[in-house]
């Protein structure tokens, strides 16, 4: 009987997501519930500052991604991540300056970031699963630790944004 190694990618993603969810909910949020939403959302935004790191995916041979995905897909991943990095910088800048319309930037960050995750899940993850034995350790670690952190941070930011805009309507 052959073992399906490809299933280790989604399984590791699930474990990573659950782990980050527990960490954030039990350690971070428990201690900072009294903060205003504009301040509480900032650490979640900070997670996205470093998404520009996917520029390194464009360097041939640095990871195994070039053996798995076509160049245009790698370019798409990189551009979405760089856009999220820039949007997180703008979000933090305007939130720090207490600009009246600052919360629009976290909204844009979440729209772009969640769209990136959706497209990657639909088109790229199946390729990673099918080619799991060619993934290098760095790429596997990103897929199973950093991407779950990004996903969990988006879920918390969406919840905070929902609460923020609902409170503004009342």
Predicted regions and their residues:
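A glycine-rich, hydrophobic loop/mini-helix early in the fold
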Residues: 11-72
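Hydrophobic alpha-helical membrane segments
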Residues: 80, 84-88, 105-125, 146-150
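Membrane-interface helix-boundary motifs at transmembrane edges
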Residues: 27-41, 94-104, 165-170
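Hydrophobic cores of alpha-helical transmembrane segments in multi-pass inner/ER membrane proteins
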Residues: 11-24, 83-91, 144-160
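Membrane-proximal helix-loop-helix units in multi-pass membrane proteins
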Residues: 54-106
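C-terminal transmembrane-bundle signature of multipass membrane proteins
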Residues: 117-127, 137-168
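C-terminal ends of transmembrane alpha-helices
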Residues: 53-65, 115-133
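Non-cytosolic membrane-interface motifs at loop->transmembrane helix junctions
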Residues: 3-5, 67-79, 105-106, 130-143
């Amino acid at each position: 009987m052959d073992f399906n190694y490809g299933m280790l990618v989604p399984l590791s993603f699930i474990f990573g997501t659950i782990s980050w969810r527990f960490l954030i909910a039990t350690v971070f949020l428990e201690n900072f519930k009294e903060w205003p939403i504009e301040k509480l959302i900032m650490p979640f935004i900070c997670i996205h500052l470093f998404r520009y790191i996917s520029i390194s995916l464009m360097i041939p041979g640095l990871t195994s991604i070039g053996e798995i995905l076509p160049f245009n897909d790698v370019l798409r991943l990189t551009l979405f991540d760089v856009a999220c990095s820039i949007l997180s910088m703008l979000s933090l800048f305007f939130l720090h300056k207490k600009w009246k319309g600052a919360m629009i930037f976290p909204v844009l960050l979440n729209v772009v970031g969640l769209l990136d995750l959706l497209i990657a899940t639909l088109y790229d993850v199946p390729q990673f699963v099918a080619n799991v034995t060619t993934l290098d350790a760095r790429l596997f670690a990103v897929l199973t630790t950093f991407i779950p952190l990004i996903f969990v941070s988006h879920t918390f930011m969406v919840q905070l944004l929902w609460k923020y805009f609902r409170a503004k309507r009342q």
